[in-house]
Amino acid sequence: MDLGIRGRRAAVAAASAGLGLACARVLATEGVRVALCGRRPDRVEAAVDALRAAGGDAVGLVADVSGAERGGAFVDRATEALGGVDILVTNAGGPPAGTFASTDVAAYPPALELNLLSTVAMCKAAVPAMIERGWGRVVAITSMTVRQPAPTLILSNTARAGTTAFLKTLATE
């Protein structure tokens, strides 16, 4: 498949395993230089090794993107490592399961920080340069629960729906 992105540069958050790594793998296969991050150095190194073994160009950064400050810092480091970021893939783990009745109000700010605010910060760090260059893409890994909420995932449903609404609004700007 040729997506027309060969030679572009991508920052892929939380990409030492799972969906993030799958995104990084596809981008690398398409000839994109990838900066990926994860919290565990051994997994970051293994992910980079796997991409390089498949012929990809990858840089690994040990980083935790589970908050606004940390998300923006990852993109800043990726920008420095790659000389810019053309494609941003926002991704992070999910907050704990729970229902409305079982979830304390105090659990909401960390969930929003993890999923919504980290995405906002990553976009704040990457999108202005994309606009200046006249080209850029933001891909957010959220959940199908933004369309149909899951009964025991109130924190995730709330944060990911907010993330989707934020990105739809950003796209119109």
Predicted segments with their positions:
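Conserved glycine-rich cofactor-binding loop
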Residues: R9, A14-G18
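Alpha-helical segment proximal to the catalytic Tyr-Lys
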Residues: P128, T172-E173
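Substrate-binding pocket helix/loop in short-chain dehydrogenase/reductase
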Residues: T99-F100, A107-L112
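The beta1-alpha1 cofactor-binding region of Rossmann-like NAD(H)/NADP(H)-dependent oxidoreductases
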Residues: P41, V62-F74, V105
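Conserved glycine-rich Rossmann-like NAD(P)H-binding loop of the short-chain dehydrogenase/reductase
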Residues: V32-A46
